[in-house]
Amino acid sequence: MQKLAVYVYIYLFMQIAVDPVALDGSSQPTENAEKDGLCNACTWRQNTKSSRIEAIKIQILSKLRLEQAPNISRDVIKQLLPKAPPLQELIDQYDVQRDDSSDGSLEDDDYHATTETIITMPTESDFLVQMEGKPKCCFFKFSSKIQYNKVVKAQLWIYLRQVQKPTTVFVQILRLIKPMKDGTRYTGIRSLKLDMNPGTGIWQSIDVKTVLQNWLKQPESNLGIEIKAFDETGRDLAVTFPGPGEDGLNPFLEVRVTDTPKRSRRDFGLDCDEHSTESRCCRYPLTVDFEAFGWDWIIAPKRYKANYCSGECEFVFLQKYPHTHLVHQANPRGSAGPCCTPTKMSPINMLYFNGKEQIIYGKIPAMVVDRCGCS
C-alpha cells in the first residue's frame, strides 16, 4: 500500500513538472498559445494593411488612366495652382475626408443629397483659333456628369489686376455666337460696375448658371466667352492670359451639382480598432497619406480614410451564406471557404494634376471600405 502511494506521488510530481499549473489555475501552454494567436493576428493584419496600401496606389493610377504618377514638383504646383477662394475652400474641405459610414441606421451616402464642386479650367477651342484677332478668353469643356437639371450654382471667377487709386471698373462678359449676317459675333451675358480700391488685385465671381444650363442643353452653342474689364482710362484689368508673376490667376468656372440617390438600408458589419482582439471578419481603420508617398500631384484630399478588412470567416458564422456552407459540406476538400472582403465601398472626390499639368476633378469609385463581410 505504501509502495502504491509512493508511485502515485511520483506520477503527480512528474505531471506537474511537465505541465506546470499557474497560481490562477490556467495552464502556461494555453496562455502561450493565446499570445501566439494574438501575435499571428497582428502580423496578419499588418500584412493586410501593407497590401491594401499598395493596391490603393495601383487602383488610383489605373482608374485615372495614368501609366505612372505624374512627375510634378511642389514648386511647379505652386505656379500652376489657381489662387482662388473657391478652390482653397475645396482643398480645406477635403484635407481629411470624414468617415461617416458607422453613423445612423441608413446609408448616409445613399440617402442624403450629395453636392459636388467641379473646377473647370479654360481650354483651346477650334472656333476661337479661327477667329480674326485674339479673343479675350475662354472656352470651357464640361464633364458628362454635369446635367443641366442638376446644376445648383455656376460661377465664373475672374481676377482683376490692382489699381493705383480708387477706380470704377466696368466688367462685361460676352458669349461667342456663330457670325450673323450683320457680322455680330457676341451676345451679352453679364455687365456690372465695380468700385476698386488701391492695393492688391481681387477675385470677382459672376453668376453664369443660366448660360451653363443652355450650353448643356445645346452643346453646339458653346463656342466660348470673352471677358472685358476696363477702368476709366480704358486699361484692361482682367487677367485672361496670365503674364509674368500671374501664375494661378486664370479665369475658371466653379460648378456645383447635386443629386439624391436611391434610399437603401444599411447591412451592418463589424468595426474594430488596431487593438481589437476580435478574430472574426472586421473593418479596421487605415488612413492613406498621399504626401507620405511623395504624390504631390494630388491636390486634394491630402489624406483620406481608406480602411481595410481582416479576420477569419468560420463556417459557424455563415448563416447569411447558406449556399457557401452547403458547398463546403458537400465537398470540404475542394472548397477554399469564404474570405473576409469589402461588401460595401464608396468613392472619393479628388483634385489632381494629370501628366499634361492640367487640373482635373474626378470621383474615384470604390476607394473607401465602408463595410466588411464573408463571401
Curated annotation (Swiss-Prot):
A Pfam family assignment: TGF_beta
The organism's place on the tree of life at top rank: Eukaryota
Disulfide cross-links: 272-282, 281-340, 309-372, 313-374
Keyword line: Cleavage on pair of basic residues, Cytokine, Disulfide bond, Glycoprotein, Growth factor, Secreted, Signal
GO CC, any one term: extracellular space
Predominant location category: secreted
InterPro entries: Cystine-knot_cytokine, TGF-b_C, TGF-b_propeptide, TGF-beta-rel, TGFb_CS
GO molecular function, one term: heparin binding
GO terms under biological process: cellular response to dexamethasone stimulus; embryo development ending in birth or egg hatching; muscle cell cellular homeostasis; muscle cell proliferation; myoblast migration involved in skeletal muscle regeneration; negative regulation of insulin receptor signaling pathway; negative regulation of myoblast differentiation; negative regulation of myoblast proliferation
Glycosylation sites: 71
Compartments reported by the entry: Secreted
Protein name in UniProt: Growth/differentiation factor 8
